[in-house]
Every structure is written in C-alpha cells, then in structure tokens.
Design a protein with these regions (language model features):
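Conserved donor-binding loop and adjoining core beta-sheet/short helix segment
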Residues: 1-49, 166-195
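A short helix-loop-beta-strand connector motif used in the catalytic cores of GNAT acetyltransferases and
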Residues: 1-3, 152-163
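Conserved GNAT acetyl-CoA-binding A-motif
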Residues: 42-56, 213-222
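Conserved active-site alpha-helix within GNAT-family acetyltransferase domains
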Residues: 57-74, 101, 225-242
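Acyltransferase donor/substrate-recognition loop-hinge adjacent to the catalytic core
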Residues: 67-137
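Conserved GNAT-fold acetyl-CoA-binding loop/helix
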Residues: 136-149
Length: 251
C-alpha cells in the first residue's frame, strides 16, 4: 500500500501542541520527491512537530530533512520500553525481589479470579476506572483514552484485548493491550487498579504476561512521557531495550 500520513493532536488537553506523525506502507518515502517538496512543507506549516518518528525514518530521512532546515532530536520521553517476557512473568533474582513480594501480598486476598476483558464485564472495568480517577486532574491522565478503549471493547469492535481481576467477585484491576503484527510482542496500553489492595499493580502486570500465549517473547510497555515517577517505575522492571523515537521541527 502507499505511504500515508496520520495527523493528530491531543483533544483532551488544550496545552498539547499540534503534531503530525507519518505511518508508512510498503512504498517507502525516501525517493518520493513530491512528498518532500510539497506534502512535508505543508505539514510543517500547519503543525509544529513531526512526532513519534521511528529509528528507521530517522536514519532514512535525516539528511533530507537537514536540507529543509528541519531539526531532528532524540525523543527520550516517547521512546518505548521493551521487556523480556520471562522477566515480567517469573520476576527472577534480587532485582525483582520487591516486585515478587508485592505480588505475594496481593495473593493473600481470598477468591482471586482472572477473566478476559470482554463485552460481559467492561462495566466492572469502568467501576475500577472511576475509583482510580478520584482526586486526579483527569486532563493530565489517560482517563479519556481508557474510556475510549473500554467503549471499543464493550461494543466488540476492537483489536484490543485484556484481562480483569476480581477479589471475592469485586473488580479490582484490569489491563488492556494488543498483539503487534510480528505476534512476538504484546503492547500494553493501560493498567488500572484499586490501590486499596496492596500489590494490585504488580499483580496485574504479572498476570497480564502470564495470560499471554507462549509465542509472545517481548512486552512493550510504551513510553514514560517524561514523567519522572513513571520513568523510575518502568526502569525498576529492568527493560531489555528501547524503541527509539524522534521529534522533528523547523528551525
């Protein structure tokens, strides 16, 4: 298929500056003179950033972009964290000792059950989201994106999958993600839990991975968006690598 452009902005936060991202089909852009002379200048005139540029795009187009007075910078805040499935599933060694202890603390609850997230239980997931959302500035969270994802699942109209955890029939946590085309990587989009249950987030992280097919070898837990607390939390799970992203803008 031809290359195509995805234009986007965050409709939930007026402070987010507009950006565009480019998704490529089988026909690459490198030799597309019309794109670089006509389309891309229009994008930079209308939007402030080319966001989520991939490593391959950076290596392919950086020289061309320099001739257009476009600056490309490494975007650490939007680079994805990649983990070995076995690490998140088994929590081995001293590095994961605290995580395993918290999982075990959650397991002390009685009558824990795990179900696939589907049309029959999204109402329970919404209850958890509501508990999680209390006393938060929702515009600075992924609350609205979670609503969209849950609505898609509730309408059985989604490539997303997930699980929901119950303690004595009370919903306490859920996660949503999707399988990437290589089928070896699972991309985790959202995790939400009732923090009144000790270890709930460590458990939902671990349970999500344990419920995946054995063919999945890697877990992509997305970016930290520059949030220092989120960054430290993601680093404590010992990523095996990153998917680098770049940001481009006109001088």
């Amino acid at each position: 298929s031809d290359s195509y452009i995805l234009i986007g902005t965050d409709e939930y936060d007026e402070k987010i500056k507009t950006f565009f991202s480019i998704l490529e089909g089988e026909k690459k852009l490198q030799n597309n003179k019309f794109f670089f002379e006509e389309i891309l200048p229009q994008c930079f005139a209308q939007y402030k950033f080319w966001k989520l540029m991939s490593q391959t795009q950076y290596e392919s187009y950086n020289e061309i972009l320099q001739t257009m007075n476009v600056v490309v910078e490494f975007d650490r805040d939007n680079s994805d964290y990649i983990y070995n499935r076995t690490d998140l599933q088994n929590l081995p060694g001293k590095d994961f000792h605290k995580k395993k202890n918290l999982v075990n603390a959650f397991l002390k609850n009685s009558n824990i059950s795990i179900k696939n997230l589907d049309t029959t239980n999204t109402k329970d997931a919404f209850r958890i989201l509501q508990i999680w959302s209390e006393n938060r500035n929702l515009k600075q969270t992924d609350y609205y994106q979670c609503i969209d994802a849950l609505n898609d699942i509730s309408q059985n109209n989604s490539i997303l999958s997930g699980i929901i955890v119950y303690v004595e029939d009370n919903p306490v946590a859920w996660s949503i993600g999707e399988f990437l085309p290589d089928e070896k990587t699972y991309l985790v989009h959202f995790e939400k839990g009732d923090s009144n249950y000790k270890g709930v987030y460590q458990f939902i992280n671990n349970a999500t991975v344990k419920n995946l097919p054995e063919t999945v070898l890697f877990i992509n837990r997305e970016q930290d968006l520059g949030d220092e607390g989120m960054r430290q939390a993601k680093l404590t799970y010992r990523p095996c690598g990153f998917i680098n992203k770049y940001l481009a803008f006109k001088k």
